[in-house]
Curated annotation (Swiss-Prot):
This is Putative membrane protein insertion efficiency factor. Its main location: membrane. The keyword Glycosyltransferase does not apply. GO terms for cellular component: plasma membrane. Coiled coil: none annotated. It comes from Lacticaseibacillus paracasei (strain ATCC 334 / BCRC 17002 / CCUG 31169 / CIP 107868 / KCTC 3260 / NRRL B-441).
Amino acid sequence: MKQVLTWLVRGYQRFISPLLPPSCRYYPTCSTYMIQALQKHGAIKGSLMGIARILRCNPFVKGGLDPVPAFFTLRRNPHPENDLDLSDIQNLNHKLGGRHG
């Protein structure tokens, strides 16, 4: 089930997302968050976390850094610095226009 859900999100990323203007207020994007949540927490909890993230992503929130936490929660990651890996830091640095390498 986890693989099917991941495949659906990747299909969205590849075929639908490029047709829409960028709108995600968070890093990583909501679709990437969903895939990471599925991988880390399984189909049910990962789906719930991804849906909660999509509902949080709206014009009334500041957005910002919100990686998938190591524990299950439907709220924003309270300690994003603890759940970053090197690729997240490099991607964020590149997105912000800094040097990376």
